[in-house]
Amino acid sequence: MVDTGTDRVKRGMAEMQKGGVIMDVVNAEQAKIAEEAGAVAVMALERVPADIRAAGGVARMADPTIVEEVMNAVSIPVMAKCRIGHIVEARVLEALGVDYIDESEVLTPADEVYHLNKRDFTVPFVCGARDLGEAARRIGEGASMIRTKGEPGTGNIVEAVRHMRMMQAQIRKVSNMSTDELMTEAKNIGAPYELLLSIKETGELPVVNFAAGGVATPADAALMMQLGADGVFVGSGIFKSETPEKFARAIVEATTHYEDYDLIAKLSKGLGTAMKGIEISTLDASERMQERGWEKGS
């Protein structure tokens, strides 16, 4: 019989990351930089999203050796990505002892119809979402943490802003609905009714909701916090910048003090060049990672 963690325990682990920054790293050296800069966790992977996007082909779970090297290098929680629907990659990461698994659209999906039943696992999961319907379905499957999908590896914040604003607007809409309207709304957005009822009563998702996908500067991180994010994932924005150590520290500080504009101005001075960005409209439909895991049965 497979051991499974309770929602309360899994969600509690995610709550502990609230207000912080989670950084993508590809080796132990980068993990140490992230930890020293104040990251609350790191995401261990073979290539940051910008490199995955540039390389093309099939992107898979990282080599377990990389994951273990990162785990041995830092004392903060370590996350790792598996492909959408790939049961065995998820089980391997769980066996390695990672603190969190990201069932991620950044990697090439293994299943175009089904996401993982995350309730079958002891390890908690984070999943991406573009709107309340997607978030609710992932939570219904057992996700303990949600993040905006944004458009990974672009250094362009516009899609993360779109997704966060969409979710916040839909949460406000549900909160103001009468109970007898909820079933129709659940049908319309493909969300579990009981979850919408919980959102109506509390005015928020039952799990933390981080921003991800396109965060490249301290100002980007502060913007997402102001829009209602509980924290920030930074993928390519740190180690594709000119000065990773400076960007890492500045983004952590800006995430914490997201309404202190004098401080954010100071943090933004002399950082060097941010990662090269990509205009979203130049991407073909096949290059848009945010649409993965959605078109067929998300």
From Swiss-Prot:
Enzyme Commission number, as recorded: 4.3.3.6
Binding site for D-glyceraldehyde 3-phosphate: 165
GO BP annotations listed: amino acid metabolic process; pyridoxal phosphate biosynthetic process; pyridoxine biosynthetic process
A molecular function GO annotation: pyridoxal 5'-phosphate synthase (glutamine hydrolysing) activity
Pfam families for the chain: SOR_SNZ
CDD domains reported in the protein's UniProt record: pdxS
PROSITE patterns linked: PDXS_SNZ_1, PDXS_SNZ_2
Reaction catalysis annotation: aldehydo-D-ribose 5-phosphate + D-glyceraldehyde 3-phosphate + L-glutamine = pyridoxal 5'-phosphate + L-glutamate + phosphate + 3 H2O + H(+)
Keyword list, A-Z: Lyase, Pyridoxal phosphate, Schiff base
Active site per UniProt: 81 (schiff-base intermediate with d-ribose 5-phosphate)
Protein's pathway: Cofactor biosynthesis; pyridoxal 5'-phosphate biosynthesis
Residues annotated for D-ribose 5-phosphate binding in this entry: 24, 153, 214, 235-236
Gene3D superfamilies (UniProt xref): Aldolase class I
SS bond partners: none
Keyword hit for Lyase: yes
Parts of the chain that traverse the membrane: none
InterPro entries linked: Aldolase_TIM, PdxS/SNZ, PdxS/SNZ_N, RibuloseP-bd_barrel
PANTHER family xrefs: PYRIDOXAL 5'-PHOSPHATE SYNTHASE SUBUNIT SNZ1-RELATED
Entry's family note: Belongs to the PdxS/SNZ family.
Function description: Catalyzes the formation of pyridoxal 5'-phosphate from ribose 5-phosphate (RBP), glyceraldehyde 3-phosphate (G3P) and ammonia. The ammonia is provided by the PdxT subunit. Can also use ribulose 5-phosphate and dihydroxyacetone phosphate as substrates, resulting from enzyme-catalyzed isomerization of RBP and G3P, respectively.
Subunit structure of this chain's protein: In the presence of PdxT, forms a dodecamer of heterodimers.
Protein name, as recorded: Pyridoxal 5'-phosphate synthase subunit PdxS
Source organism of the structure: Halalkalibacterium halodurans (strain ATCC BAA-125 / DSM 18197 / FERM 7344 / JCM 9153 / C-125) (Bacillus halodurans)
The gene coding this protein: pdxS
